[in-house]
Amino acid sequence: MLGSSAVFAGGFQLNEHGARSMAQAGAFTARAYDASAVYFNPAGLAFQQQNSVYFGSTFISPEIDFYGPSNLGSNKKTSMKNQVFTPIHAYVKYGITEDIHFGFGVYNAFGLGTEWDPAWDGRRISIKANLQTFYFSPTLAYKVNDQLSIGAGMNIIRDPIFYICVNWCENMILHGSFFV
């Protein structure tokens, strides 16, 4: 017989690319009900009959506590600094012809961070990390027939990412990149 202690997730995932995406916990790739298809499935834009503009934001204020051994061997509680994140999403869908459709999106695929007291026990791993990317995504969709469409897009990513720790890890500041 095996046993384990409690396990808690410590990662992050953003599904704030549209209201339906959030409601379906990100299980939205095969759907194309609105202009957020720019992010999930550009080919789906070809099946949308009307031009549209779609935008929004989400308020995220995480509260995280770390319980770990202190120098004296007891479990010490350290709380992360309170922060507010507001990932955005904005999409435009425009039908050029009946079969060719253009989409453009601006959104945060990642938009969270952490900040701890510089004297906390995990300071050699991380004091501050920030991953807030801005995606600019032009897309095209072509409706082949009533059951098939194809789509393509490009992501231009602005990623002001930084990571700070104490002593043995290297502090990193990464600036914008271009990916296709």
Language model segments and positions:
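Subset of outer-membrane beta-barrel
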Residues: 8-180
